[in-house]
């Protein structure tokens, strides 16, 4: 209890310090006392009593922090009995490359078993949950259908429902919550490891809201019993700079904000910066030599991208590392212009979109987008305005559904 009170007062002191520093920096200006966003995890007073005396399973990675300290370390130091940690794609420490199989291990620092949900099984098994009373989910998401943390959330909820376990969600802001955009996946044939939900490409929900959506829209055979610790002082239009990189290739705020637009290129002949230390801020391909002055060379980077597209070849294209993100925020849209531009500039258009399921005429791009319509529209030269118009019926229907599950304005 003493340690809990100590941490609580440290949090108050930190918040006061931020406000005090603002006053010192601008002594002659009117200081705006905007409420400070406080994540669910940082509101320990709201959930510590609920964890006491229970055997806890924690779904976590490097973004799971209380203050600046790992949630595993913090909760353990506060006397919480964490018996198991479940890690998503990229692993518990967040140092595995995209798509890489992650094995079970024991955390060297705490001795706690770490179960990979991106290895032999994506869903916790009955045996893995047998010695757990409560599951806690605390992972930062970035608001895209093709970012696999929401897949992990569904699998964990399904396992909890099947095994009579409750799920406590420590909610975090969605840095891309301002945008609900892109085509809505409506056909099962486009389901894959990077998309299993009938949402637009960007859904505009936090993890807590998405959990309510999964329960309410019948994604689970039986609803999961959930308890959500909401983010304090937050709404969907508020900017949020992530305190920790959510995955190895989202290593800057610029990359996080560009991710919804640039991740589309993973299903094309264009390299989106993987194999560099500025992923998701640059675009290019060797075939664009002579059409763009900007160039870079993707290489193998352990823990980020071992086999990037166009490895060891000079790529030419676009440098978006200084692109004004405010333009995307104000438009409340993902960008289509870069996709259209680079397709039109690419000399070998027949090989711009990379293969996926050839027997079904589904490209890797289609699996990421959730439909084959966009690919066919790009090839046919349909204008951006008409492409966006074709998305509207699905978007309007989804937005009406989404409204039922929002926890924040």
Question: Positions of the model-derived regions?
Answer:
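Glycine-rich, charge-decorated loop segments at or immediately adjacent to ligand/cofactor-binding or catalytic sites
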Residues: 94-99, 168-190
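Conserved functional hotspot residues or short segments at active or partner-binding sites
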Residues: 279, 284-390
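Glycine-rich, aromatic-lined ligand/substrate-binding cores of catalytic
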Residues: 232-316
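Bacterial Sec-dependent N-terminal signal peptides
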Residues: 1-32
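Glycine/threonine-rich flexible loop motifs
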Residues: 141-153
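Glycine-rich oxoanion-binding loops at beta->alpha junctions
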Residues: 103-131, 144
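Short internal beta-strands
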Residues: 83-90, 170
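Conserved anion/nucleotide-ligand pocket segment
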Residues: 190-262
